[in-house]
């Protein structure tokens, strides 16, 4: 196989003082952090779609990249060439996982039969690539939003035949994910939403997508898939309003359809931005609700109202995110997938490495800082002290349902309660976090 990235052997850790742009400066896979290898904490994955499928087109311009596998020719042969380059990239980046949509790795074809045949061929190709490289599949998913048939959604489409086609894609992609040893399966409702309420039956569409998710869960149990099912929240784009708006909305949906024990969330930083939340908020919310699963690590631009999918570069933001994840016990089947793309002007093929190296170093440094926060214990101590009253006899009786409103009213009167506000010490805590980060 002819090498595509022929000027690079493999990206390696060379230390923070090294100036080699094709080396890691903070990501040392074998470094032990809180008793575990750094690589096992972070569980990095590179995505197929932005890295190997996007041609550099945007709303105002055509493809800007010259990728050999994106030229005209035999679609299946080009898909195999793309797989060659992808696994060369994964190996040279030293990333343990990858992620894909079905049509990222396989030509969709002109019919359902062609789609199924192509995907079967490419699943075997990927299996061979994984076996020879040691790279594993973090998660697979189905693209049920790009094709024109999905203009009005997939599971929420007014046409049950479109619903059925989407079900076929998800059925096939789930089976491929299982065959490839995928540790999760993701459901992102790219067009599960509406443009206008004038032609939308909200209750009908909610029932449709609820039933779709129930069928996904049923299929998981029928086939014995051991991975985690994940929904990826996003508030809008491409639709005006999407039903999986944010973590809290997804949790309400899961509760409605009895799926809160079956499906968790894959949280993307840029989607949190679009929903008007911080990335930290969405991670903490998912953990508090018991549905935290995995992360799409990227960043958005707060001055822009769309999904820019830039590589993460804020140690400050991600240190707090990793702090929450570590406190919750870390990833189980999930990981940090870089759902990010180089900028349209970044046309050098090695820009793909620069973007991922910077992101991996960012998350590695964030992990180290989060570990300092854990080991120091002062942030947790401050929070525990703030809520200490709820460990008292009064607090416990309230929480255990042993006191009614009337009981509390009597208690307050009998004890002549006159509580005073206690400082939240926000500035003190912010200063402490800055010292962890900057020393």
From Swiss-Prot:
InterPro entries xrefs: Xyl_isomerase-like_sf (IPR036237), Xylose_isom_bac (IPR013452), Xylose_isomerase (IPR001998)
Residues engaged in binding Mg(2+) 1: 232, 268, 296, 339
GO biological process: D-xylose metabolic process
Active-site residues annotated for this sequence: 101, 104
Cofactor note: Binds 2 magnesium ions per subunit.
Molecular-function annotations in GO: magnesium ion binding; xylose isomerase activity
Enzyme Commission number(s): 5.3.1.5
Subcellular compartments: Cytoplasm
UniProt entry tagged with the keyword Glycoprotein: no
Superkingdom of this protein's organism: Bacteria
Membrane-spanning ranges: none
Keywords from the named record: Carbohydrate metabolism, Cytoplasm, Isomerase, Magnesium, Metal-binding, Xylose metabolism
GO terms under cellular component: cytoplasm
Family, as annotated: Belongs to the xylose isomerase family.
PANTHER family hit by this protein: PTHR48408, XYLOSE ISOMERASE
Subunit structure: Homotetramer.
UniProt protein name: Xylose isomerase
Organism: Yersinia enterocolitica serotype O:8 / biotype 1B (strain NCTC 13174 / 8081)
Encoding gene, per UniProt annotation: xylA
């Amino acid at each position: 196989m002819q090498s595509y990235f022929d000027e690079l052997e493999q990206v390696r850790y060379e230390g923070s003082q090294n100036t080699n742009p094709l080396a890691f400066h903070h990501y040392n896979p074998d470094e032990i952090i809180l008793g575990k290898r750094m690589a096992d904490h972070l569980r990095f994955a590179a995505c197929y779609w932005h890295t190997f499928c996007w041609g550099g087109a945007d709303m105002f311009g055509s493809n800007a990249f010259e990728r050999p596998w994106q030229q005209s020719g035999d679609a299946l042969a080009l898909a195999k060439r793309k797989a060659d380059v992808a696994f060369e990239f994964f190996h040279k980046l030293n990333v343990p996982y990858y992620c894909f949509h079905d049509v990222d790795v396989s030509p969709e074809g002109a019919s359902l039969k062609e789609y199924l045949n192509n995907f079967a061929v490419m699943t075997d190709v990927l299996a061979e690539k994984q076996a020879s490289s040691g790279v594993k599949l973090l998660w697979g998913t189905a693209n049920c939003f790009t094709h024109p048939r999905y203009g009005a959604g997939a599971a929420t489409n007014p046409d049950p035949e479109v619903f059925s086609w989407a079900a076929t894609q998800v059925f096939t992609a789930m089976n491929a994910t299982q065959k490839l040893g995928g540790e999760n399966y993701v459901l992102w409702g790219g067009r599960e939403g509406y443009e206008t309420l004038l032609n939308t039956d909200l209750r009908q569409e909610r029932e449709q997508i609820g039933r779709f998710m129930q069928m996904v869960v049923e299929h998981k149990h029928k086939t014995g898939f051991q991975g985690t099912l994940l929904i990826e929240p996003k508030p809008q784009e491409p639709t005006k309003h999407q039903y999986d708006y944010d973590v809290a909305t997804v949790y309400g949906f899961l509760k409605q359809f009895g799926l809160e024990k079956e499906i968790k969330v894959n949280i993307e930083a840029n989607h949190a931005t679009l929903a008007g939340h911080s990335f930290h908020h969405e991670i903490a919310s998912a953990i508090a609700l018991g549905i935290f699963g995995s992360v799409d690590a990227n960043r958005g631009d707060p001055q822009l109202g769309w999904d820019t999918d830039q590589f993460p570069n804020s140690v400050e933001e991600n240190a707090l995110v990793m702090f929450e994840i570590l406190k919750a016990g870390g990833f189980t089947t999930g990981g940090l997938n870089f759902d990010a793309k180089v900028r349209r002007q970044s046309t050098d093929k090695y820009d793909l490495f620069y973007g991922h190296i910077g992101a991996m170093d960012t998350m590695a440094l964030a992990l180290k800082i989060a570990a300092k926060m854990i080991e120091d214990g002062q942030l947790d101590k401050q929070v525990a002290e703030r809520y200490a009253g709820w460990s008292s006899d009064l607090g416990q009786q309230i929480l255990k349902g042993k006191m009614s409103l009337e009981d509390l009213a009597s208690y307050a009167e009998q004890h002549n309660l006159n509580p005073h506000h206690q400082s939240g010490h926000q500035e003190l805590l912010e200063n402490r976090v800055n010292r962890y980060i900057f020393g």
